[in-house]
UniProtKB/Swiss-Prot annotation:
Belongs to the type-II 3-dehydroquinase family. It catalyses: 3-dehydroquinate = 3-dehydroshikimate + H2O. Homododecamer. InterPro entries: DHquinase_II, DHquinase_II_CS, DHquinase_II_sf. Gene3D superfamilies: Dehydroquinase, class II. The record marks R17 as: Transition state stabilizer. Disulfide bonds: none annotated. Pathway: Metabolic intermediate biosynthesis; chorismate biosynthesis; chorismate from D-erythrose 4-phosphate and phosphoenolpyruvate: step 3/7. Substrate binds at N73, H79, D86, L100, S101, R110. Keywords: Amino-acid biosynthesis, Aromatic amino acid biosynthesis, Lyase. It comes from Synechococcus sp. (strain WH7803). GO terms for biological process: amino acid biosynthetic process; aromatic amino acid family biosynthetic process; chorismate biosynthetic process; quinate catabolic process. Pfam families: DHquinase_II (PF01220). This is 3-dehydroquinate dehydratase.
Length: 147
């Protein structure tokens, strides 16, 4: 099984950007922990981060036929990007939306996601552990494990 971890704008600043909201772990810390989990689960994990919408769309296109599932934290593009939504729908790869903060407890413009209604699930509000929960959920879904 192959998964793609896709992170959008400003996620590269984790650990520095508003640590009271997003925590002190860096993106590298999160990726390392998920790589360990993936290894234990016999899953291959690819990672990609970009601050550019077009690069994220292009990476989703490249994933077609090469990955079984996508974990995506689209950052601010969650609330604005029809292009990213269309790319995810176009490749028809199951995906889970993930956020460190609870987007529903923040500013009203963050309450709407252009991805959530087509995602297998959405995990938010648990800091860096949101990624672990999303990983477990996606792997279990792809393996046909019922809750």
């Amino acid at each position: 099984m192959r998964l793609l971890l896709l992170n959008g704008p400003n996620i590269n600043l984790l650990g520095q950007r508003e640590p009271g909201l997003y925590g002190h772990q860096t993106l590298s810390d999160i990726e390392l922990r998920l790589r360990d989990r993936a290894s234990e689960a016999e899953v291959q994990l690819e990672t990609f981060q970009s601050n550019f919408e077009g690069a994220l769309v292009e990476r989703v296109h490249q994933a077609m036929g090469s990955v079984d599932g996508i974990l995506i934290n689209a950052g601010a593009y969650t609330h604005t990007s029809i292009a990213l939504r269309d790319a995810l729908l176009g490749v028809a790869i199951p995906f889970v939306e993930v956020h460190l903060s609870n987007i529903h407890a923040r500013e009203s413009f963050r309450h709407h996601s252009h991805l959530a209604d087509r995602a297998l699930g959405v995990v938010c509000g648990f800091g860096a552990f949101s990624y672990d929960m999303a990983f477990d959920g996606l792997v279990n879904h792809l393996r046909g494990v019922e809750a």
